[in-house]
Amino acid sequence: MMRILLFVATNLAVVLVASITLSLFGFNGFMAANGVDLNLGQLLVFCAVFGFAGSLVSLFISKWMAKMTTGTQIITQPRTRHEQWLLQTVEELSREAGIKMPEVGIFPAYEANAFATGWNRNDALVAVSQGLLERFSPDEVRAVLAHEIGHVANGDMVTMALVQGVVNTFVMFFARIIGNFVDRVIFKNEEGHGIAYFVATIVAELVLGILASIIVMWYSRRREFRADEAGAHLAGTGAMIGALQRLRSEQGLPVHMPDTMKAFGINGGLKHGLAGLLMSHPPLEDRIDALRRRG
C-alpha cells in the first residue's frame, strides 16, 4: 500500500509540474488567443482520475481475472506428488524472498509457461501450466518459480499498473488538447465540441496510445531482466539459464494464455527490430546472455 501511495503522490506532483510548465511557456495564452478556453490544471486532474482508475481496478481484480481467463485451479489440498512438490517449493522460495506464501495454482496448457499476479506482494498468485509441471525437470520448474517469485518480491504487478496509469493520464490529456486545438483553431468551431473534436481526440488517442505502449513495454522488458536476476539469486544462475534455454527450445509452440496475462508470463519475446518495441518480454537469447554476464 505504501508503494501505491508514494507512486500516486509522485505522479500527482508530475501532473502539477506539467501544468505549471505549460503555463510558464505560455501554452494557456496561446490556446486562449486562438479561442480555446481550456483549464489545463482541471483537465490534468480529470485525466489522472480516469487514467489511474482503470489500471488500479485491473490491479485489484487481477487475481480473479487471471483465474477466470486461464482456468487456473488453486491448490488448497495437494492431491498428487506434483502438487505437493509445487506447494513446498513455492513456500520455500517465498520464505527466501521475504514475502508471504502466495496462492498457488495450475492452469491447463501444453506449453511451458507460468505467471504471477496480485495487487500486493503479500497477497499474490503464482500459477504454472500443466505442461511446465509435467515436462520440465524439477530444477527447471524451480527456476521458473523463482523468476515468478522475483516478480512478486519486486512489486512488479503494482508498478506496472501505476506506470500504465501514468501513460493513460498523459494520453488522455494530450489527446484532448489536440482535439480542442483542431476543433477550435483549425475548424473554427465556437459552439461546444464539434465532430472535429471527437474525431481528432480519438485519432490522437490511438497514435499516442501506441507510443505509450512502447514505453510500457520497455519497462516490462526491464522488469523481466530483474526477475531473472531474482530467479538466479533464489534458484542459482545455472538453473535459471537452463530453464530459459529449455523455454527457448520450445519457442514456436502455440501460446494459449490470454493477451491480458502474456505480460506476466515467463515465456515470450520472439520478435526483433521495430516489432520488438511492443513485446512485453526481451528475446530469450538476450536474457540468457544477461545472466551469463552476471556470472
Swiss-Prot record:
Gene3D superfamilies tied to this protein: Metalloproteases ('zincins'), catalytic domain
- What name does the UniProt record give this protein? Protease HtpX
State the UniProt keywords alphabetically.
Cell inner membrane, Cell membrane, Hydrolase, Membrane, Metal-binding, Metalloprotease, Protease, Stress response, Transmembrane, Transmembrane helix, Zinc
Instruction: Kindly report the protein's main subcellular placement as a broad class.
Output: membrane
Q: Transmembrane stretches, by residue range?
A: 4-24, 41-61, 158-178, 198-218
* A single Gene Ontology CC term: plasma membrane
Task: Give the location in the cell.
Answer: Cell inner membrane
Its BP terms in the Gene Ontology are: proteolysis
List the source organism. Pseudomonas entomophila (strain L48)
Tell me the protein family, please. Belongs to the peptidase M48B family.
Positions bound to Zn(2+): H147, H151, E224
Which NCBIfam families does this UniProt record tie to the protein? PRK05457.1 (NF003965)
Q: How is the cofactor bound?
A: Binds 1 zinc ion per subunit.
The uppermost taxa in this organism's lineage are: Bacteria, Pseudomonadati, Pseudomonadota, Gammaproteobacteria, Pseudomonadales
Q: Name one GO molecular function term.
A: metalloendopeptidase activity
